[in-house]
Amino acid sequence: MRVRIILFIAAVHFCDFLPAQEAPKPFVEYPEPIGSYLTRIQKGAQEHAFNASSNFVKWQKHAREALIELTGLKQMEKDLAGFKPKVTIGESKKTEDSFTRTLCSIETEPGIQIPFYLLLPKNAKKTRTLPLLLCPHGHDTLGLHSYAGAFKDEKHRQKVLGKEGDIGAQAARRGFIVIAPATRGLAQELLIPDPKKRHGNRPCRAQLIHCLLGGRTPTAERVWDMQRLLDWAEKHPLIDSKRIVMTGNSGGGVLTAYTTAIDSRIKVAIPSCSFTSVMSKEGFIFHCDCCLVPKLRNWGDWKELGGLVAPRHLLLVHGVSDGLHHRPTVDKLGRQLKNIFKASGAPNNTALEWGNSGHRFYPDKMWPFIEKALAKKEE
């Protein structure tokens, strides 16, 4: 007993010499009373906050229905009832790679043509269906071309490959069929002009303002476009509709998160450099204006968004030097998602990985997760 006491005292004295652990630094700082005001008004009612004691299936159903309403997607469904999307297939172009590349388009609402690349492995056969990768881009006006490896010039090629950003081309080499679509308000082909620079000369913000006036959001428009592509893909003879993977970086990751939360046809989701809470504890809002869903904090937060993906597969990927996001906030969210997935009965179907650089794709983190998830589906 005496020995134990001596050892305890020694340990206490030793700890006195250890440097104090620093508390995580705030992501930003607001002056008072602004800081308190922001955190107070942004707290929200959290009406669909996850509760482990609730029935998981019922919680998901009600939370998903409310999210569809909140984004304005329900409004779009009403406004566009009876409209039939039309797909136009372009001329297939052979590449020096192991796949063909075809620039196509889909009319998702009257007069709105969404261009997309369709990548098909050259060895694809009608006797065997292949998994699909749907990969919408973020704030890159050449985004669909970047992801599909359809480079405009050498400078574009070097920029994309320097960050391993040709994620669609990578997937096609791995035997995936790929749909790399333009993202509304972000692709050069689908920008909303800001003629008088009233919206800061930012096309994505102009899109937000116009959408809000019509009872929808850019998120709703973008999810709508992805769903119409999924409708078409499900009927494609070469696509295995039970093995659909979705990914995108930055704004493309935000779109991946919302689409997967709303549409259960996505089996594996990898939102890159995007999946985080709505705001930091100081009140800083992490995502671009165009990702805004009004009253989202009255609904819940991104942990609930991730909870709508469960028990399907969800990998969060971030870069350690990405200045747009806050590691302590992301790490906390990762732990919260583990608990939600545990409640769904699939604790191992979500993970958080950190890449060693900034705001970009991390294929070395993504592909092992995808392969493992799809292998499970085949068992």
Regions found by a protein language model. Give the residues of each.
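Glycine-rich active-site/cofactor-binding loop and its immediate structural neighborhood
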Residues: E91-K152
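C-terminal catalytic histidine-bearing segment of alpha/beta-hydrolase fold enzymes
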Residues: R335-E379
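Alpha/beta-hydrolase fold nucleophile elbow
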Residues: L238-S250
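N-terminal targeting or regulatory segments adjacent to alpha/beta-hydrolase or S9 domains
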Residues: A20-T100, T108, E379
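Short beta-strand/loop motif that positions the catalytic acidic residue
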Residues: V309, L316-H318
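Mobile cap/lid helix-loop segments that gate and shape the active-site cleft of serine hydrolases
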Residues: R205-A206, H210-G214, R228, I266-G307, ...
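Glycine-rich nucleophile elbow surrounding the catalytic serine of serine-hydrolase chemistry
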Residues: G248-Y258
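Cap/lid segment of the alpha/beta-hydrolase catalytic domain
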Residues: R128, L134-Q227, E234-K235, S280-I285
